Amino acid sequence: MDGDLPPLPRIAEITRRHDAWLLVDDAHGTGVFGEEGRGSLEHFGMETKEILQMGTLSKALGSQGGYLAGPRAAVELLRNRARSFIYTTAPAPACSAAALAALQVVRREPDLRRRLWENVRRWTSGLEGLGYDLISKSSPIVPVRVGGNRETMALARSLEEAGLYAPAIRPPTVPEGSARIRTSLTSLHTAGDLEEALGAFKKCLQIS
């Protein structure tokens, strides 16, 4: 929800110590983290032995469906035993083709990833410069802490009126008293887009 990174190397140490497997849900990491966009495991430089990585094809890759990657024996076991796989519907061919094409873009166009992280740095710096409290700034998901539900909804409405879609996230999705505005960046946002969005946040500060 907040785009924050867990201490995966430390967690992997614990699983190895107890002869357990580690399952990493990398829904927001695929295509974004790592030198080649392989996700959180690549970001931390971790080996994939006794680690399963799962994720979605619907975020950075812009398609539908999901994936599970790991040692062949483990994947084959799940392919034959996991009810969630056995009883699911196969993805449409067009979605599979779109996901494969997106993976090629991830591999061949690292400039898109660099541009994304430049946008993250520009955006977080701008919000903090305005005095907003950021819960996390380690990913393209940047949540802005507000606190109360009423104040958060009011801010979301004001931003929408200014032409900016930034959803309000409230309990029970997050703990009481920690409602927030969830902002998300892409590599396609221009410097002008970010300046306009920061202007909307600044205007909302003046209104409040």
Where are these regions (language model features)?
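PLP-dependent enzyme catalytic core of the Aspartate aminotransferase-like
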Residues: 161-164, 173-208
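Conserved PLP-dependent catalytic core of the aminotransferase class-I/II
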Residues: 97-165
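A short glycine-threonine-serine/GTX helix/turn-capping micro-motif
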Residues: 65, 82-91
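AMP-binding (ANL) adenylation modules
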Residues: 93, 148, 171-176
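Short hydrophobic/aromatic beta-strand micro-patches
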Residues: 69, 143-147, 184-186
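Active-site PLP attachment segment
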Residues: 36, 42-77
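Active-site core of PLP-dependent enzymes with the aminotransferase class I/II
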Residues: 1-19, 151-152, 192-193
